[in-house]
Regions:
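N-terminal short beta-loop-beta anion/metal-coordinating cradle
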Residues: 20-24, 29-58
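Divalent metal-coordination and catalytic microenvironments
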Residues: 18, 40, 64, 93
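Glycine/charged-rich beta-loop-alpha catalytic/anionic-binding loops adjacent to active sites
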Residues: 56-67
Length: 144
């Protein structure tokens, strides 16, 4: 296999699950707008199920996820579109406890990735913060 070959078999389970999802799709009545007028910005941590946390269901909310639940330029762009085009009138920024992004600083993550994987990530800003409350205040101010 050449370096440019795509390992399709690595996604067979996902393709099978998607076929089943299509066959049993139960959300065709949803419009794509946020039925409850809410957007959530939260962490990519797979332990978090944002809909369950706030007692909502598919179609109610726009969910944006990234490392550390930070309001980046791309998140802000998406929130603007959701607000003006997709019925969002409330935004919940929802970081969480025990977040890896609050355990280290930028230099630590760059060093770790370089040492363990040989990949130089110094051109990226990970937006780590040991002060989650301070970061939340900054992010809320960006939204305002």
């Amino acid at each position: 296999m050449s370096n440019n070959s795509f390992p399709h078999e690595a996604f067979d389970d996902l393709l099978a699950a998607n076929a089943e999802y299509q066959k049993n799709f139960k959300y065709s009545e949803l419009t794509g707008s946020a039925a409850k007028g809410l957007a959530i910005v939260t962490c990519m941590d797979s332990r978090i199920n944002p809909l369950s946390v706030i007692g909502m269901k598919s179609g109610d909310v726009k969910i944006l996820r990234n490392a550390g639940a930070r309001v980046t330029e791309d998140v802000l762009r998406t929130l603007v579109l959701a607000t003006y085009l997709l019925n969002v009138n409330r935004i919940l920024v929802m970081p969480h406890t025990d977040c890896k992004m609050a355990e280290n600083d930028e230099a630590d993550f760059h060093k770790l990735i370089d040492e363990q994987y040989g990949v130089n990530t110094s051109s990226l800003e990970f937006r780590t913060s040991r002060d989650q409350r301070g970061s939340l205040a900054i992010d809320l101010n960006r939204i305002r």
